[in-house]
């Protein structure tokens, strides 16, 4: 429903107003986010938003391709983002057993913010991530809508854009197996032996890869990297500290932190 609402909003704005496509897309994205937020309120569960994070980018690119058409380069960019979205959605589905489950971070925010939680829920859990992901997918959308030409250096970043979700998937499987064993402590299997947050590292890599592939195809416009930079800041200053703080409750965390890189 949110996706359909977003597409309707985009078409409605384009038909009635002469805004630039970037602004029209942003308005439609925010409108869809409001729909998701309303459902999260109805179900009393902010985790309703989580799959929107992974569905939003491929849908935006697919709509752009349907309206504008695309070169092989544009379709490969879309395929990389679609692969990323499928991996992230599959991991969410694996963890989300029912509406009784809610991400621990949202539960923590609700406990800490009290009566202000509805505002924090909308601005912090729903709107802010939507804006970050919008900025992340904007470079690839620009490639499609402006018909940017492929350049040889783009091949490197396209390869990395496929590698990032591949390694994220590997990290997911390793973590799921560790949790099934129920041995407690810290996961030190595979990628987790080298990094405390390999999934976050690959998420950062993913959007720098998409951003840089688009950056070089579009004559090195620096603003195209704003999304990758914002996404990196989100993980470095919010996601990683929150996860480490939660892990710090376990015995031996200080030693584990010394032995294992953050990313």
Tell where the protein language model's regions lie, with residue ranges.
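Membrane-helix interface "capping/anchor" motifs
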Residues: 40-49
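Interfacial loop-to-helix junctions that mark the boundaries of transmembrane helices
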Residues: 19-21
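Hydrophobic transmembrane alpha-helices
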Residues: 3-8, 13-17, 29, 33, ...
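Juxtamembrane helix-capping/reentrant segments at transmembrane boundaries
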Residues: 48-59, 101-124, 185-192, 262
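Juxtamembrane interfacial secondary-structure elements that flank transmembrane helices
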Residues: 93-102
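N-terminal non-catalytic cap/leader segment that marks the start of a structured domain
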Residues: 36-37
